[in-house]
Each structure stands twice: as C-alpha cells, then as structure tokens.
Design a protein with these regions (language model features):
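A short, N-terminal "cap"/entry segment at the start of jelly-roll beta-barrel domains
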Residues: 1-38, 118-130
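Conserved short histidine dyad/triad with adjacent acidic residue
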Residues: 26-29, 42-57
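A short hydrophobic beta-strand segment most commonly corresponding to one strand
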Residues: 89, 103-119
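Short beta-strand His + acidic residue motifs that chelate non-heme Fe in jelly-roll/DSBH
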Residues: 54, 73-74, 90, 96-102
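Glycine- and acidic-residue-biased ligand/ion/polar-headgroup-sensing regions
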Residues: 59-61, 65-71
Length: 130
C-alpha cells in the first residue's frame, strides 16, 4: 500500500492569530498533519503592505516559492523584488524577511526540519535602514 498524506493547505489551522500575528498574515504549518518526519512546509499569506520579522536557522536550508502577489524579500543585506513563481533558496545562516506589496504576498516555504532551529530577528528591517 502506498504511504502518503493528502490535504488542502487552506483547510489546515491558521497559526498566525495564536502567535499575535493575525493582523499581518495567515500562516499554515501542516507538517504534523501531513505526517512529515524530516521536512517542513508552510503557507504564508501576508496581507498587503505588511512586513514579517526576520529570522535565520541554525541548520535548516529553506526554499520559498511565490504563489501569488508581489513584494520584497530582505535577504541578508540585499533586497529582492518578488513576483509569482519566483523561487528563493536560502542557506541556514542567511537572514530572511518579507514585505507584501499592494496585492499581498503568498509564499510556500519548504525545508528540512529540526526543532528549535529558528533564530528570530524582530528588528531585521529597521537594522538595515528600511
């Protein structure tokens, strides 16, 4: 028998509100619902004009894919404009933060998964003159 899990990401729990970020985005982290053991995935729907805090990882590499909308990614000290179907690979130690354009920004994020691997950078934008 095939071993797989199928679900719709929009039907998973929106975790943003329980972390005080409901005004900024929807955030779906269906790793457990999918039964993932070594990988992670998330759907992040950033509201128009909103910025997400930055973060890095200790060991996890990530790939972000723009599903819809537009915006700007803060990647280390660089800024990269984003549009649908852009993909960005990030080494663990590279700072990443996102800002939605006027039409919002929807991202799928994929990566390896290790507990307690994230290092938050809440002042990423202001520390880089933005």
């Amino acid at each position: 028998m095939a071993d797989y899990t199928h679900l719709n990401l929009l039907e998973t729990e929106d975790d943003a509100a329980k972390h005080g970020m409901g005004d900024t985005l929807e955030a779906h982290f269906p790793r457990e619902a999918l039964g993932c053991e070594r990988t992670g995935v998330s759907l992040q729907r950033i509201k128009p004009g909103q910025r997400l805090f930055g973060h890095t990882h200790k060991t996890d590499e990530e790939i972000y894919v723009v599903v819809a909308g537009s915006g700007t990614a803060l990647l280390g000290d660089d800024r990269q404009e984003l549009r649908p179907m852009d993909a960005v690979r990030l080494a663990p130690e590279t700072l990443r933060a996102f800002e939605a354009g006027p039409d919002g920004l929807e991202l799928l994020a994929f990566g390896t998964h290790h507990d307690d691997d994230s290092v938050m950078a809440p002042d990423a934008w202001s520390q880089r003159g933005a």
